[in-house]
């Protein structure tokens, strides 16, 4: 069957969040479990300005692999430079999925308005 290309277009939204380092797993799983894909993390550093890197986390397996990498090295999360405040660019298949992600982050107390 033919589907309109617009129907398959992904949507994106930038979410501002804040949490402790030990809440990283809960945050990332809330995103992927609600249909979101974590594209980037970005912080606003007072001296260096915006610092951004790609994460490309699309499922629980990606999140677990990322968390294992974090745990296996002397790594401090980027968000520690800004007291846990950071942004994620989230991609999803629909606006409804982004709304689910937003609600989950709000319910966890991570979403910053």
Task: Label the predicted regions.
Residues 10-113:
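Mid-protein regulatory/catalytic core that forms ligand/cofactor-binding pockets
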Residues 1-5:
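Minor-groove-contacting beta-hairpin "wing" of winged helix-turn-helix DNA-binding domains
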């Amino acid at each position: 069957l033919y589907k309109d290309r617009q129907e398959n277009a992904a949507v994106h939204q930038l979410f501002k969040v804040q949490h402790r380092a030990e809440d990283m797993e809960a945050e990332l799983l809330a995103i992927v479990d609600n249909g979101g894909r974590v594209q980037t993390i970005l912080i606003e550093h007072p001296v260096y300005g915006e610092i951004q890197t790609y994460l490309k986390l699309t499922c629980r397996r990606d999140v677990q692999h990322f968390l294992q990498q974090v745990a296996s090295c002397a790594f401090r999360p980027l968000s520690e430079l800004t007291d846990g405040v950071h942004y994620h660019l989230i991609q999803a298949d629909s606006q409804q999925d982004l709304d689910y992600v937003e609600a989950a982050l709000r319910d966890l107390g991570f979403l910053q308005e």
